[in-house]
């Protein structure tokens, strides 16, 4: 057991360990409140005095819900080691979340947006106070659950942090190699002598790698054998890649995110965005509302992100980019009713949707349905190596578990899609039937009116009504092997015919 004046902990309750300190779960001696204590080791005291106190000074300056709070600075009894008493985050770190097999292919979109919002807010507070972190990575982003069960992410570990204005530079090297800016990587990992100075944008590179890792479950730049086994190739990948190049399929949220990551993962600091532009672009994403659209031709659910002040025309264009259904051919159903979206209206008029209650999109164009497109999870199942290797076997088993969870996620998406597909087709057939009934009723009324006007010719008119009814039914539900697809397009045609029949009655 170890303790300070007000806090007590057991060395078995280790939360994390670094080169200069260890972090433990501790309790307040009086209240029993759980806290995290950072206990500095003897190696930490070999650093210059100003470096030793820098973390205390930085944390005292910060006060934000997305930054771990500092409660007190105390000392252990006998050894008089410095101890930082901080807020305890019970749900581990973002790294532990990403290490879970169900997130092997990235966080769910909703959870990723929570990470993005929290990291951006925390970093914005750092820059407002002129602080550069210098060691942004998933392991230094803690997670706890709010009162309503929502995730809250907080930046932590300010051992490498220091005050630095936008136009200032530093030459000391800190950080974790997978998340280091290439210029720092060259000097810290490859041990190549160079006298480059670094600015605040090195944090942007680390943020870009972290966000990519959270979105996809993997690092953006990985050489064969891994980044720690092939360091020279790792450096060449990051420095020789084309400007703006980044892996990732551009769909939904990713189409908004990829340009941001591409512009912060730039080696040349002159080409890299500054924090002002990064905050502006990420805020643009976070201020958008999501509209859930289920495409019947694709049998797929899409997330369309738009601003409330956008017009419906912008929404229709965004749907076109994801579904290839042109705006003039888009028709929507919502909760069983035809939903008419006027292009000039504000997007605020679009109904509130959820994943289980989306807008249902069908196309008025005679196109062949594209069907589902997904990657077979079996392709991601790794192979076990013949020789016994505990670490390799662990990684392989973890990869297999990740592929299993991906297959489960895909199966759930397919089942949900099947339900939405059946429901959408049911609504579509009901709409067709209602339109046909209205059109036939108008036609019948028109013929009755004509028969009363023609007198002796009424018998012929009755025969004509039967013929028209047969023709109408054959047009709406034509016979053939393709079944319902033949009766899909004429909704507007039937509406026009109904209007023409009404005009005949008025005459």
Language-model-derived ranges and their functions:
Residues 22-43:
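Glycine-rich ATP phosphate-binding loop
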Residues 72-74:
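A short, aromatic-enriched beta-strand patch in the conserved N-lobe beta-sheet
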